[in-house]
């Protein structure tokens, strides 16, 4: 069997880009077979190997497994890296601990591939589990044989092969695999045996479904590659079906953002119907859309400097945002010059709810001004407001300057010189 797997591995070039590979070894039959396979064919694959093992401390066999793996590494001159799980045990916490440890070892020890012993039975179980949970079609493609991980790749050379084909070599049995406390165990030990009485090719059918799903979504990705997804013009001129695919594909780029079908529909509707929107999604993510584009972004708390107001006295200089303001003192590098009709201090700040500016015949809300001038939400956040005697005297936004209209009785008392520091 190993010869067949070797030929398949070589034909696919799974390890062509790697010299040092880290093997995840639990002590079960799958991972011990993987260890034996990669150790036996190191020369043919042009690799050197290391072993990563987690002692979860949940079973009395854990110490024996660790000791066996340590001794195996010493006998075969293979480095072994051990980590110990601590805290309250759960499947999710244990999995996170494992993969964080694998990533750490790879980065610190120079391994460029993590290799795990997932096989075809695992693939069938994963697809079935996702069907039970109501996952979207794209996720029925299941486990990928090669995927990006840490500073390299995660490779699963056994994935096309059923567990029953692996040699029955020495290994440790995990008694928890018989427990019905875990969904995957119930699928393996209860649901599959019952359903296979109706269709004895059930696992093969699920694997075929995963392969066809993968093929379908690869084709859709290829066919839509030229579309700039976050460009509103490009996105909105597609059919609704293509829009759904594009948005699903875009959201999938954020692994820690899991949106429900209802949340997805809300996001899609906002993109289709709103010109400007900032919408909080979940898990620290929000949707930002303006007239030209939309983006999903991780929310970062606003800094104090964003909220601060600065007081500018006559004959003084202040820096606020990207601008240098000189009140009454000429500067040759000024990009903007504003006439000032009072010598009282000028407050430099960001916009506030209810801000208005006098434009001559009428007073206009800043919010309405931004809408009329098609100022994007990002540009609105960066707008600089100049206030004097509790009255707005200027707004700088999107490279434009809007000034309060002076009355016919106003007398100019000085000038405000403004330099855009980003132009230096």
Curated annotation (Swiss-Prot):
UniProt-listed Enzyme Commission number(s): 6.3.4.19
HAMAP family given in the database record: tRNA_Ile_lys_synt (MF_01161)
Function: Ligates lysine onto the cytidine present at position 34 of the AUA codon-specific tRNA(Ile) that contains the anticodon CAU, in an ATP-dependent manner. Cytidine is converted to lysidine, thus changing the amino acid specificity of the tRNA from methionine to isoleucine.
Main location as per UniProt: cytoplasm
Keywords, sorted A to Z: ATP-binding, Cytoplasm, Ligase, Nucleotide-binding, tRNA processing
Keyword Ligase tagged: yes
SMART domains xrefs: TilS_C
Catalytic activity: cytidine(34) in tRNA(Ile2) + L-lysine + ATP = lysidine(34) in tRNA(Ile2) + AMP + diphosphate + H(+)
Gene Ontology biological-process entries: tRNA modification
Compartments, record wording: Cytoplasm
Positions bound to ATP: 26-31
Domain description: The N-terminal region contains the highly conserved SGGXDS motif, predicted to be a P-loop motif involved in ATP binding.
GO molecular function: ATP binding; tRNA(Ile)-lysidine synthase activity
Family label: Belongs to the tRNA(Ile)-lysidine synthase family.
Protein name: tRNA(Ile)-lysidine synthase
A cellular component annotation (GO) from this entry: cytoplasm
Family matches, as PANTHER family: TRNA(ILE)-LYSIDINE SYNTHASE-RELATED
